[in-house]
Amino acid sequence: MFVLVEMVDTVRIPPWQFERKLNDSIDEELNKKLANKVMYNVGLCICLFDITKLEDAYVFPGDGASHTKVHFRYVVFHPFLDEILIGKIKGCSPEGVHVSLGFFDDILIPPESLQQPAKFDEAEQVWVWEYETEEGAHDLYMDIGEEVRFRVVDESFVDTSPTGPSSAEAASSSEELPKKEAPYTLMGSISEPGLGLLSWWTSS
């Protein structure tokens, strides 16, 4: 679920931090810049793990701050495909079941990846597994807040870097706002034995 990613960045330390240990200042600046940010095709940055190398620091004319090239390793949330995770149901919609891990919310289990047969209850706004028994179908509701075990089957990165509007977009910008896309999305599946709500598979 978590991986260590080697990175290199130039860190600017302002003069009023010179009295502190350099590593402490760099640690703070890197976490301020990267923590809780999604890096394209890398994952969600969590926190600094360690600093592996510090190159020479430079002070440029007109800027009293020091600039240091830093080699470091960062803890990144990037689960591998087919990994099994446990989260909580954040909500349900016709698009599927939305799951949260607490620190990461952009997880979707689409209808075709639910335990089948499944239906969406419009009145309750929840997905229901119509579990077949000898006594007939038994509805198992996927309620908000329930813990769910799922398999990661796909991921999607979207480059959300700001870009200048095109002429066509500029003309329509006053009419409608573009839909905000999540920079990193996971697609899950619970369509196999043992997956789904933990309460479904609790041994009696």
From Swiss-Prot:
Start-end of Low complexity biased regions: 166-175
A GO biological-process term: defense response to virus
PANTHER family associated with the record: DNA-DIRECTED RNA POLYMERASE II, III, DNA-DIRECTED RNA POLYMERASE III SUBUNIT RPC8
Protein name per its UniProtKB record: DNA-directed RNA polymerase III subunit RPC8
GO CC field: RNA polymerase III complex
Assigned keywords, A-Z: Antiviral defense, DNA-directed RNA polymerase, Immunity, Innate immunity, Nucleus, Transcription
Family: Belongs to the eukaryotic RPB7/RPC8 RNA polymerase subunit family.
Domain of life: Eukaryota
Annotated signal peptide: none
Record-linked SUPFAM superfamilies: N-terminal, heterodimerisation domain of RBP7 (RpoE) (SSF88798), Nucleic acid-binding proteins (SSF50249)
